[in-house]
Regions:
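Acidic Gly/Asp/Thr-rich repetitive segments characteristic of extracellular carbohydrate-active
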Residues: 29-68
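Short, compositionally biased P/S/T/A/G/V-rich stretches that sit at domain boundaries
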Residues: 304-341, 348
Length: 352
């Protein structure tokens, strides 16, 4: 049984470890965020940190394990590091409502957002994050935004196929599972879309559910792209002037064989295709590792595997930030000895 005392000591120990390991430069400073004032963090929210004159561009903010904050805005160029997500052994910090990122060159890593994310400046990086809803710009200009190793529960949307306002986005090593009636990834100009699993499970043909829609000038390679069976003819929809190569995708063979010859066409919907492509075993997103006889094995450019667990930025289950320690076991003594309580913790380092 996990006690309040155990949680309190574990959070405090992890916070100390994060500050020890997290400092990146001599000048930049590190700050803890925790909505629980009894944890004695530097700030109770990201918003409070942004309002402080002490927090400067280049600083790093760490979300304490178990921290829960709502509707946050990043208005300074900082690095925000979370705890990863949904690990049974480690308390998750998360942001409810939404996260708006308004400062260019901001990096957000290992953060769980239960709502939307607005990317409202250029050169933003989201890495190892979980976003349960959608991602778009909310009307802002945001060039060269990168999404790496992220788990997205709805869609990613730019501002159009000829708009420089969302030029040059990169989506790599991600798992994107949308049930939306439009594209799971859509309205992008000159993007790089590589080594992802992108699904659109919406079944009605009244609309245009697609894995990729309205993409111009893109490089699209080494992905697994799946649609529902009755919409498999539109897995790629309005994709123009793009290099589409070495992907595994659900499709109508009569249409795709000629249009996209350098790809593997599965005349199946996602429900039938997933057990063919993926192992479908293990916990959490490990189910999307390739099956031993998967058609995606070695099917990518240069003989690489397709899908999110291959390539230069392979997906990381639970989204733990690289180089950050996390505790997987904590034991608190049941009896004080000489006024002291014995606490034992097993701490691991995320090394991939």
């Amino acid at each position: 049984m996990t006690t309040k005392t155990q949680n309190r000591h574990s959070a405090a120990a992890m916070a100390a470890l994060l500050l020890v390991f997290g400092a990146s430069t001599a000048n930049a400073r590190s700050w803890r965020i925790n909505n629980d004032e009894t944890k004695k963090a530097n700030f109770t929210s990201i918003n409070a940190a942004m309002s402080s004159e002490d927090v400067q561009a280049g600083d790093t903010l760490y979300l304490d394990p178990g921290c829960v904050i709502a509707s946050q805005t990043i208005s300074k160029r900082i690095t925000l590091i979370g705890t990863g997500y949904l690990s049974k052994a480690h308390p998750t910090a998360y942001i409810t409502g939404g996260l708006s990122i308004k400062a260019a060159n901001t990096k957000v890593e290992g953060v769980y957002c239960t709502g939307y994310v607005y990317v409202q400046a250029s050169y933003i990086i989201l890495e190892r994050c979980k976003v349960d809803s959608y991602i778009h710009t909310n009307g802002a200009t945001a060039q060269y935004v990168s999404f790496r190793q992220c788990l997205i529960g709805n869609y990613i949307e730019g501002k159009g196929t000829t708009s420089n306002e969302t030029l040059g986005w990169t989506i790599e090593g991600c798992i994107i599972r949308s049930g939306y009636s439009d594209g799971s990834v859509r309205s992008l100009y000159n993007p790089i879309i590589r080594n992802n699993y992108i699904l659109n499970s919406y079944t009605s043909t009244t609309y245009s559910p697609s894995a990729l829609r309205k993409i111009t000038g893109g490089l699209i390679e080494n992905n697994v792209l799946l649609n529902a069976k009755n919409t498999r003819a539109q897995t790629l929809w309005d994709v123009e002037n793009s290099t589409v190569q070495r992907n595994v995708m659900s499709c109508d063979e009569t249409k795709y064989a000629a249009t996209y010859p350098d790809n593997i066409c599965l005349d199946l919907g996602y429900a039938e295709a997933e057990p063919v492509v993926f192992a479908k075993t293990g916990e959490d997103m490990n189910i999307y590792r390739l099956a031993d006889d998967s058609p995606a094995k070695g099917a990518g450019v240069g003989g690489e595997d397709c899908g999110p667990f291959a390539g230069a930025m392979p997906f990381v289950v639970y989204g733990r930030p690289y180089g950050i320690p996390y505790w997987i076991e904590s034991q608190v003594g049941t009896r004080a000895i000489d006024g002291k309580v014995n606490i034992k913790q097993k701490v691991m380092m995320q090394n991939d």
